[in-house]
Amino acid sequence: MKKIYFTLLLVFSCTLIFAQTTKQQAKLDQKAKEMEAKVIEWRRHFHQYPELSNREFKTGKMIADHLKSLGLEVRYPVAKTGAVGILRTGKPGPTIALRADIDGLPVVERNSLPFASKEKATYLGQDVGVMHACGHDTHIAILMGVAEILAGIKSELKGTIVFLFQPAEEGAPEGEEGGAALMIKEGVLEDPKVDVAFGLHISSQTPVGTVTFKPEGMLAAADMLKIKVKGVQAHGSAPWSGVDPIVVSAQIINGLQTIVSRQLDLTQAGATLTVATIHGGVRNNIIPEEVEMTGTLRTLDNTMQDEMHRRIKRTAENIAESMGATAEVEIIRGYPVTYNSPELTDWAQPVMERVAGKEKAVVIKAVTGAEDFSFFSQKVPGF
């Protein structure tokens, strides 16, 4: 699978810059084949030494050093720990951004592979393992290989290619900026002015050798919910003397689930709503004054997202009021819908079919996972 995506990113870049002949296509395929061993070696190195979001210090430096060795214009650090390489051919043509995310996750790796991660870190005040459990090690290695090949054929290219190695895709630590939004804020799409952006994501759920895609909304928007329910504290022996926020919270949780199942037109766009944490109380025999809940909302359409926000607030507040309590609802907008330009999708499909085979370039349904490549595709046509 890694070879397929590596070749695709390479071919996307070159196809936008010049119309390839069969001979040029064969040359790119051969260069990708020759680069494969190096890409695997890089991937295993990054897998063995993962770093958490906004803490990718060694990762970012290794990437920047590689880009410098290729003779590229390098900006580092960007967005705290990221790196940007710019290949200017000196000839008129489009400016193409190729993006890879570089952060790992607070996950303990449990296998006996020789390149398994044994890294540790502190996350939310706890000692945790660190693992590239989402494939970003592969993304880094692929883009490093693509950069090396394109730098080697610079004289045959036109336009400009911007290599974006982005930190903190998994989310910056609380209280910090990070990720694609911070890269954009720091101007990575402006100097040089990017015309189109490409990203990729490997998946263990996709058969090896297959590439999947979808025009328009591909991945969901992801928002965070915080609901604070306030009641009246009382002793468990006399619940009538207070207002039980735990019971109110239970009713709110059930009520929220009816929004998706009973109120939305699911033939238009889907949504998922999950309450994932609930905290309240200090003793087994005391009804608490307050309960806090958090959760996540996933939507596949911007209009649906706005409507869900309105209904969540209305449902929680009205249920609480009907039971003598209050509910404070905060919805924190996260990553927007990852939108694939229909025009770029139409252009890319025959390229994917050539590289993977027509039967293995598969249009799929939207996925409710989220990706902050969506911020790039909000600013420029993306795929």
Label each region the model flagged.
Residues M1-K23:
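Bacterial Sec-dependent N-terminal signal peptides
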Residues Q20, S69, A250-F383:
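Metal-dependent amide/peptide-bond hydrolase catalytic core
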Residues Q20-M131, A141-K158:
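Acidic/His- and Gly-rich active-site-bordering loop/insert found
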Residues K33-A37, P50-K61, A133, D137, ...:
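Soluble non-cytosolic domains of exported or imported proteins
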Residues M35-V39, R43, H47-P50, L70-G71, ...:
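Sec/Tat-exported extracytoplasmic proteins
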Residues F46, G85, L98, H136, ...:
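Divalent metal-coordination and catalytic microenvironments
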Residues K120-M131, D137-T138, I149-L150, S155-T277, ...:
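Histidine/acidic-residue-rich, glycine-tolerant segments that coordinate divalent metal ions
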